[in-house]
Amino acid sequence: MGTDDLGKGEKILNGFQINWMILRDADTGKIIWQENKDFSCPDVEHEAKVPVKILSLRAVSREINFSTVEAMENFRLDQKVLFKGRIMEEWFFEMGWVSPNTTNTWQSTIEAAPESQMMPAKVLNGNVTIETSFYDGDTLISKSVVRLYYI
């Protein structure tokens, strides 16, 4: 099957990869966690070991560095935070146009839920997954799942 036979989403995915991801304290800029791993791969459940102190931060700055062969007209992410399979939070991020054959860094800020809604790390540990759907407009590129462990 040639690339002309592939659907748009599959064609983008074939030339797409996440190079690294960094989470920072949004107030201080201090790096809390970083990983050089392609979290966009849809065929496996990924794991991330994140310091427990991330749960006490007011906001987290997330940087995603990615490369793409194909142009994307409206690159965006939909993320669902699930606890034991039930949606706790849902976030929507839009980057917009991405040029072909480029490497890009995308920074987003995620504010914490109110303290009254937070659960302890020992309850969350291993029971939280983040389901990320990568889109170009309405075309699904990939859906990945990352299970969180707090250390």
Curated annotation (Swiss-Prot):
InterPro entries: Ig_E-set, PDED_dom, PDED_dom_sf, Rhodop-sen_GMP-Pdiesterase_dsu. Keywords: cGMP, Cytoplasm, Nucleus. This is Probable cGMP 3',5'-cyclic phosphodiesterase subunit delta. It is found in: Nucleus; Cytoplasm. Belongs to the PDE6D/unc-119 family. PANTHER family: RETINAL ROD RHODOPSIN-SENSITIVE CGMP 3',5'-CYCLIC PHOSPHODIESTERASE DELTA-SUBUNIT, RETINAL ROD RHODOPSIN-SENSITIVE CGMP 3',5'-CYCLIC PHOSPHODIESTERASE SUBUNIT DELTA. Pfam families: GMP_PDE_delta (PF05351). Its main location: nucleus. It comes from the Eukaryota. Interacts with Pde6. One of its GO terms (cellular component) is nucleus. The keyword DNA-binding does not apply. One of its GO terms (biological process) is sensory perception of light stimulus. The gene is PrBP.
